[in-house]
A protein has these predicted regions:
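Active-site-proximal segments of metal-dependent phosphoesterases and phosphodiesterases across multiple
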Residues: 168-188
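N-terminal, active-site-proximal structural segment of metallo-dependent hydrolase catalytic domains
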Residues: 1-100, 130, 137-140, 156-161, ...
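Active-site-proximal beta-strand elements of phosphoester/diester hydrolases
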Residues: 1-5, 114-117, 160-170
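Solvent-exposed loop/turn segments at secondary-structure junctions
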Residues: 1, 35-39, 66-71, 108-109, ...
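Active-site catalytic loop in hydrolytic enzyme cores
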Residues: 116-156
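Beta-strand-turn-beta hairpins that frame and shape the catalytic cleft
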Residues: 105-110, 139-169, 312
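Metal-dependent phosphoester-hydrolase catalytic domains
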Residues: 107-115, 119, 123, 152-153, ...
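Extended hydrophobic secondary-structure segments that form protein cores and membrane-embedded regions
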Residues: 61-65, 164, 209-215
Length: 312
């Protein structure tokens, strides 16, 4: 999602469709993936202004420079050329391409945010990095493909609710070493360890009210990737899986080409096991008479918006 698209008086249909999807969801907390980052926050401001024009308000925003497109200075993919998109910390043609942003109606405790975006992959316990990277790449490559955040929000009661947000690497587009597959697996394992009390810096995570959310990029039942790792995360005793479904009952969250890669479940919201989930779903209309219509949702993204209602 580009700034130029958002400020254009005649925006592309996919931008208008994205706004339609966000308005239809009307979430209190919204994690957007794939939004380009700029240091002054112009793109995010343009997005919130466009939503405000549709009477949807998000007064509290958070975004930081992602790893996508950030130079490493080494030949990560080993093809003998430097400075290409696959040599960046996360795949990207420019730094900030396809970043993340959190939009919230609850105040963000900005000074308490824990940002793990710069954590080195090789520093993860039992990291796969030394097996799949060159020594030079292992010294500099970060674990997060895009970003990894622990963001506390302040509820009206004064209590905090944490959003654990990330966007993992697709476990494809590599070679026989399975570099991206193992990176994806370790990005998921990071959060398993974090929930178990391990921390890359600072105190252990002890919050009771939280949700882990983002694009994990692995389906536990089919497709590429180390499916056993995502299944272990889904089974973690600190989490629950509401298993949001589309109106037709499917769990898949993408509309991809069949048979490969096929429609897969790669997007998740996993609340704390102690929270009361009252409803969940996937915004995937089955007709043109729905609001928004099926074609608009398809134009917005090949991923579908998933949602979970919590009562606590």
């Amino acid at each position: 999602m580009l700034l130029a698209d958002l400020v254009d008086e005649d925006p592309d249909p996919d931008i208008a469709a994205t706004l339609d999807v966000i308005v239809a969801a009307n979430a209190d907390i919204l994690l957007i993936l794939g939004i380009d980052y700029d240091a002054e926050g112009h793109a995010l401001a343009a997005l919130t202004n466009a939503l405000a024009a549709r009477e949807i308000s998000y007064p509290h925003l958070f975004s930081r420079r992602p790893n996508t497109g950030r130079p490493t200075g080494v030949d990560v993919d080993g093809n003998g050329r430097l400075g290409e998109p696959r040599d960046a910390q996360g795949y990207g043609r420019f730094n900030g391409q396809g970043g993340m942003a959190l939009l919230s109606r609850l105040p963000i405790e900005t000074d308490q945010i824990r940002d793990f975006t710069d954590f080195l992959w090789a520093d993860l316990p039992e990291s796969a990095a030394p097996r799949v990277l060159s020594p030079d790449a292992a010294q500099v490559l970060r674990l997060a493909t895009v970003a990894a955040w622990d963001i506390p929000l302040r509820r009206t009661t004064g209590a905090t609710f944490h959003i654990l947000a990330f966007h993992a690497s697709p476990p494809v587009f590599d070679g026989p070493e399975d570099r991206n597959g193992w990176r994806n697996a370790d990005e998921l394992r990071f959060w398993q360890l974090y929930l178990d009390g391990w921390s890359p810096n600072g105190p252990a995570f002890t919050a009771e009210n939280f949700a882990l959310m983002g694009t994990l990029n692995v389906d536990p039942d089919r497709g590429e990737g180390h499916r056993e790792v995502v299944q272990t995360l889904l089974d973690h005793p600190a989490l629950q899986d509401p298993a949001p479904r589309a109106p037709d009952g499917r769990l898949v969250t993408t509309d991809w080409d069949e048979p490969t890669p096929g429609n897969l479940r790669v997007d998740y919201i996993l609340p704390a096991a102690t929270l009361n989930v009252t409803d969940s779903g996937i915004l995937w209309p089955d007709s043109e008479t729905a609001t928004p219509p099926r074609s608009a949702v398809a134009a917005a993204s090949d991923h579908r918006l998933i949602w979970v209602d919590l009562e606590f």
